[in-house]
From Swiss-Prot:
Keyword Phosphoprotein: yes
Residue span(s) of domain BTB: 28-98
Organism expressing this protein natively: Rattus norvegicus (Rat)
GO molecular function terms noted in the UniProt entry: ubiquitin-like ligase-substrate adaptor activity
Phosphoserine carried by residues: 149
Top-level taxon of the source organism: Eukaryota
CDD domains for the chain: BTB_POZ_calicin
A Gene Ontology term for the protein's cellular component: cytoplasm
Function: Required for both nuclear and acrosomal shaping during spermiogenesis.
Kelch repeats by residue range: 280-327, 328-375, 377-423, 425-475, 476-525, 526-580
Protein name: Calicin
Quaternary structure annotation from Swiss-Prot or TrEMBL: Interacts with CYLC1; the interaction may be relevant for proper acrosome attachment to the nuclear envelope.
Keywords assigned by UniProt, alphabetized: Cytoplasm, Cytoskeleton, Developmental protein, Differentiation, Kelch repeat, Phosphoprotein, Repeat, Spermatogenesis
Amino acid sequence: MKLEFTEKNYNSFVLQNLNKQRKRKEYWDMALTVDHHVFFAHRNVLAAVSPLVKSLVSSNDMKTTDELYITIDPNYLSPATVDQLLDYFYSGKVVISEQNVEELLRGAQYFNTPRLRIHCNDFLIKSIRRVNCLRYLFLAELFELKEVSDLAYSGIRDNFHFWASPEGSMHFMRCPPVIFGRLLRDENLHVLNEDQALSALINWVYFRKEEREKYFKKFFNYINLNAVSNKTLMFASNKLTGLENNSAHATLIESVLMDRKQERPCSLLSYQRKGALLDSVVILGGQKAHGKFNDGVFAYIIQENLWLKLSEMPYRAAALSATAAGRYIYISGGTTEQISGLKTAWRYDMDDNSWTKLPDLPIGLVFHTMVTCGGTVYSVGGSIAPRRYVSNIYRYDERKEAWCLAGKMSIPMDGTAVITKGDRNLYIVTGRCLVKGYISRVGVVDCFDTCTGEVVQCITFPIEFNHRPLLSFHQDNILRVHSHRQSVEINLQKIKANKSTTSVPLLPNSCPLDVSHAICSIGDSKVFVCGGVTTASDVQTKDYTINPNAYLLDQKIGEWKTLACPPEALDCPACCLAKLPCKILQRI
């Protein structure tokens, strides 16, 4: 009789014991030296995982009693990395982070271990985001990681307006010529306008003038001078005096300026590259007259006072929420004829005009507030049913492809007004909840720290309004809450609220701001509003109609301006500020 017995996890058991022997310096027959640090190991183990070690053993005709010594340059691999590599060779486990991925890639290259290289490649793909895509592109080019290179390049191209801004330019000025030239040549480059592209080129050349001046002539040809403003052309002309062989470029600039003097002034928009960005307000979903739900996606182009239809949502809903993050718009929740609180979530790609289904929200929500902070999308509060509010704050985790509970507000609310400060803090200001059995807006400010998942500051203050307020920051610590009846200035440092004499005028149709309106701050103290319900002039009839107009409030002078009429009158649509590529104008 014969019986076969197999030990479970025997290979792992053997390697674990070999690793213990290595750390105790037992039975070793090779050593790696890095900057006075000596690491002992077993030749057979390393030869099995590293073609480098196997080659050294075979090429030197080593005998079983011989010992192998390898000296590693500490400028290439640190002692800590070599120790981590040895642990990986013996256990097959490795922890990769943004801090150690470059050295691990060097280690994979040095020891010629393809599997470790694959792990590093996968980590880079899963962890890439706006703030690190420039560094990841450098790594991808250095270690020939094509998929990472393509993703990182797309990340830089899609966020060029950030990298060329004062906030991002400190790192971007180190961009190598081959990458910088490729970006300027790209018709889909996301610049604010061609002015930014020309200014970025001049700043990049002057950052290392002696070595980069030779690239200026070639890269200058990638700029469409007809799309550049007179002010920036004059700036460029002055800068050219500091560069050699600039006469041809100066002549081109002078030619454009002279032509403009002789022609009728016209918009530069038609000359912009396809990827140039347009500040826009995007309206999604909503409810039409007679109760029909909408799936249309419309964009108001601020610069042109023009409405466009972008797309159609994959579902019809009102009281949903939306936020923009880079080239994407995220939408979730809402109500339909059949379901009062939807879990569904989608992502719209403004560049490709395409939709991607996302994992469902953990719970169905209406009147929740979606917001982007630090490049991450959050959903704040909301209702799961009439008069049933939640305090949950959800975060969409791009790596896990899941909605995760980020934390909770101090009290359950829907219809909250939210403003961000930096890349870390959400300020959740007022919201609707049940007070003594009645739906009422409460005066509360929660400062939610997205890193800790905690409300780090909660301030309550008396309010005399039940409509949706407008928010803005004055100086660094003063949060202004503007409404029709009263305005409040909250000192976040002293935790003190003071009434202000300024107030928000009623809409031109004499209605107050409400959760049914699409409301969007668009910078420079201006607020966009459209849709929502309006009460009939005869108060006795108590009839409600949907507001067909769009308005713009200039808070500096306290006046409303009526804008181009929206394509449809909508109640409770989602609304967000977005930067749309100029190529969408070609769809008109």
